[in-house]
Amino acid sequence: MKILWLNSGLLLPLDKGGKLRTWHLMRHLALKHDITYLSFAERGQSHADRVGMREVCNALETVPRTDPAKGTLAFYADAAKHVVAPLPYAVGKYRSAEYAALVRKCLESGGFDVVVADFLPPVANLPRTLAIPSVLFTHNVEAEIWRRHAENASNPFSRALMTQQWNRMLRFERDALSRFDLVLAVSDADSQTFERLYPGALRRPIHVVQTGVDTSYFTPMPGKDRRAHLVFTGSMDWLPNEDGMLYFVRDILPRIRQAEPDVTLSIIGRAPTPAVKRLGEEHGIEVTGRVDDVRPHVAQGDVYIVPLRIGGGTRLKIFEAMSMAKAVVSTTVGAEGLPVTSGQDLVIADEPAQFADAVVNLIRDSSARRQIESAARQLVVEKYDWAAVAQDFEDALAAVRRGAAPVRLSA
């Protein structure tokens, strides 16, 4: 197949869950298919990132773009502009006449068999109708993320803004789903939420492509020398991650420290916001920023924590930690959409006291911790290696090209 793949940015560096998911899928697809990848590229993006993209695509087309840094005057001015715009901010900021023109040029001259829109933003730059089969690859239910932002907003002004964005996203997401021949979701939970929110919008049933993990890369590592050490990984400029860490340090960590005074915490991930950096300064927490390899950091943890209150899709970080045989404690939202069993593969805990107790129990009970670690590793190795997930994705593209519905794989 000749595939036109649309995204809002380059996949490199591989520092976000959505980038990782797409990278692994494209890496397998590129072995047999011809992929043209079209996206924005940040001005100043390294030449190495562009060259590295050739591992997953045959051709790379980019449109230059600069995203204002979060917290700057330019960032707030850009956000304010979109308060009165009709599109939701998360989509509207990517609307571009230059991008749309490049898409039209590719569609008119490329002889493509199928077009894949990766996430929602590229949809804003697509023609209303397409002459070739089209697939929307969703990694989240975006409207649900904004609903949770609104519910967890700290003041009435923020709540009003988040509610406005939620309502705009509901309208845009419904319209986007209706425009594609096939919609792919990353979990049964997301599929069910789409069907509940947007009845009648879909051309055919949603196909679920499960989350995978590179089990040969994320393997158990020796050398742990820190007791009572907790680890969290993620892009720290993504609001759900920032909110989760602020919530954990405010409401959960003090309870853990009452029982385990020597407990330590590392927050590993790119672009920590000022609020996250203050956690390191005021609470004795290690905030690393971007690291080249998360594995040595994860390996040092007794417990891997995912205290998210906002989110959608699935958390690749959980499968990565499980693949490294780490005991995970997560909220229900954090583990949403993953085919895991609490008490067997990981521990689910939603209330602060419950979450703290689960962490303390795993720190103290090495036998229970090892049992969960072993079960976690076994689950992902047996069922969720990327090769099998990518084959399902490929089969779905081939089916929509033929005009057929993909065959659902059993979990």
PLM region spans:
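Acceptor-binding helix/loop patch of EC 2.4 sugar-transfer enzymes
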Residues: 8, 69-93, 135-171, 235
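Acidic donor-binding loop of glycosyltransferase active sites
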Residues: 181, 284, 290, 299-313, ...
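A short, well-ordered alpha-helix in the C-terminal region of glycosyltransferases
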Residues: 368-382, 389-392
